[in-house]
């Protein structure tokens, strides 16, 4: 009879393997239920046959078995929404780019300037491939480049090659790859080849296909060189110490950014007078500032660079907008400089400095050495310290003999022109809704229509921090309306007419 009972039990549990641990599991489960706790002992793992069947349909639950059966997890993992996929890829890009510090990787130490001064500005700085080899990047360039290539392949797999957001992400990943390759070639002509690919060149044409950035540089050189600044109004003396400048900027940013903790600090390692980070601005220890300088820093570093970083950080899906790959540099730097113009805070000397850097990059591309460019800056009236700093900006990372500069400084003037054209065209074609998205984060112009279109489905959040003239576009609309007419008026003929009129003044 015992054998028949065992046989019947086998029939009732047809297909199941014997389990010697079941009584112990049942006892533990009953104890957990009595104590009001969740079951802590998992059911036995199904064998391969059971697992393969459960994918198609979960096995029926035996009412005599206190443990419910659990189907195996799908091989592909849980279902993910489009926004989840984008956010995960964006997070991966942000994390992958974190150790990349372009300006840190190509900086020169103070001894270089001292040696150049001792040589009476006649000997090339001793900065070459061996010099940069001693400065670690903080990552393996080949491995980091391969990581970004894998991210680009993941984007194609997850989003497809025709997805517009995917195209932005892919371009961003591949630009970071090329940035890493550029840094891996410091001190060689290959560095310049990547720099030109990433940041452009003064020889690049504007969208009209005819006018180059160099053409703009030569035109502005003639105009700005002839401006007599003594006739323009009051002079702004640089008498404000760095700590006082930082305190004033902290006060202004507290009013502008409110609860967002944007801080201004004094830094003794800066090469420039000021620089912006994601939520901070640093001013160089020992530098002195005028009230106009502080006005410019408020707009340039705060209203644009910090604000776009904060707007990007506020994104829950489009997280890549908080970081600025080279493809966004022209819009970022040009927008900051253009806001100086819109707020009437800039001045001819500063405009000349930006334009002269374009011409200096062009000269270096055409073979001028560090000493040649340094001497050119001296002929333009800069003091020797500023000559060195301007020339260093152009040759850092490249080849001091000439022919292979760092071309980033060409982005500022190009960005002024292209941002102005973007804003004017948006107003002319009744697409003013796109203009605020210049501030949604670190963007290129081709990104803006795509990002604006994805607000409704939650992929992108509109920008929170906008400069006053972009929160209320009425003034810019009138400005651009008249600007459109002025460009069609026939500039030379009008200028000649007034030149004859001015001649009457003697």
Regions found by a protein language model. Give the residues of each.
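Secondary-structure capping and boundary motifs in well-ordered enzyme cores
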Residues: 290, 294-295, 299, 327-332, ...
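Active-site-adjacent bridging/hinge elements
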Residues: 274-280, 307-312, 386-392
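Post-HExxH zinc-binding segment in Zn-dependent metallohydrolases
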Residues: 322-362, 415
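Conserved alpha-helical "signature site"
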Residues: 350-506
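Post-HEXXH active-site segment of zinc metalloproteases
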Residues: 292, 307-332
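Active-site recognition of the HExxH zinc-binding catalytic motif
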Residues: 295-312, 336-337
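N-terminal low-structure segments adjacent to metalloprotease catalytic domains
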Residues: 2-214, 476-480, 485-506
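Contiguous, non-catalytic segments that form substrate-binding/exosite surfaces or channel walls
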Residues: 159-292
């Amino acid at each position: 009879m015992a054998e028949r009972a065992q046989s019947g039990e086998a029939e009732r549990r047809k297909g199941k393997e014997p389990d010697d641990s079941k009584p112990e599991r049942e006892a533990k489960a009953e104890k957990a239920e009595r104590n009001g706790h969740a079951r802590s002992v998992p059911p036995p793992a199904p064998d391969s046959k059971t697992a393969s069947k459960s994918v198609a349909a979960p096995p029926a639950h035996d009412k005599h078995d206190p443990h419910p059966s659990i189907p195996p997890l799908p091989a592909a993992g849980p279902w993910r929404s489009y926004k989840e996929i984008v956010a995960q890829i964006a997070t991966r890009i942000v994390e992958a780019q974190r150790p990349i510090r372009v300006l840190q990787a190509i900086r020169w130490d103070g001894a270089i300037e001292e040696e150049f001064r001792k040589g009476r500005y006649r000997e090339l700085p001793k900065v070459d491939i061996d010099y940069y080899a001693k400065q670690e990047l903080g990552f393996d360039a080949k491995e980091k480049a391969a990581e970004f290539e894998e991210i680009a392949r993941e984007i194609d797999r997850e989003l497809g090659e025709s997805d517009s957001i995917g195209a932005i992400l892919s371009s961003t990943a591949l630009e970071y790859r090329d940035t890493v390759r550029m840094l891996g070639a410091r001190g060689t002509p290959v560095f310049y080849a990547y720099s030109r690919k990433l940041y452009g060149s003064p020889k690049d044409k504007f969208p009209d296909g005819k006018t180059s950035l160099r053409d703009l540089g030569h035109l502005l050189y003639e105009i700005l060189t002839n401006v007599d600044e003594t006739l323009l109004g009051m002079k702004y003396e640089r008498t404000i110490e760095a700590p006082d400048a930082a305190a004033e900027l902290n006060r202004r940013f507290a009013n502008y950014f409110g609860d967002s903790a944007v801080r201004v600090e004094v830094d003794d390692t800066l090469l420039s007078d000021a620089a912006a980070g994601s939520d901070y601005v640093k001013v160089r220890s020992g530098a002195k500032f005028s009230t106009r300088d502080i006005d410019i820093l408020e707009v340039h570093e705060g209203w644009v660079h910090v604000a776009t970083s904060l707007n990007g950080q506020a994104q829950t899906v489009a997280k890549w907008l908080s970081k600025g790959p080279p493809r966004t540099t022209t819009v970022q730097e040009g927008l900051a400089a253009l806001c100086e113009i819109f707020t009437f805070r800039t001045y001819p000397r500063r405009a000349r400095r930006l334009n002269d850097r374009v011409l200096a990059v062009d000269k270096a591309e055409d073979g001028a050495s560090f000493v040649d460019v340094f001497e050119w800056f001296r002929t333009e009236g800069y003091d020797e310290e500023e000559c060195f700093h301007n020339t260093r900006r152009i040759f850092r990372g490249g080849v001091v003999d000439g022919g292979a500069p760092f071309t980033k400084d060409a982005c500022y003037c190009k960005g002024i022109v292209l941002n102005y054209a973007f804003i004017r065209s948006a107003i002319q074609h009744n697409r003013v809704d796109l203009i605020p998205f210049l501030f949604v984060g670190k963007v290129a112009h081709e990104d803006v229509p795509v990002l604006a279109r994805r607000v409704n489905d939650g992929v992108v959040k509109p920008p929170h921090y906008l400069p006053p003239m972009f929160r209320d576009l009425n003034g810019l609309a009138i400005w651009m309306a008249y600007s459109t007419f002025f460009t069609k008026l026939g500039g030379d003929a009008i200028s000649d007419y007034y030149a004859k009129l001015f001649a009457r003044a003697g």
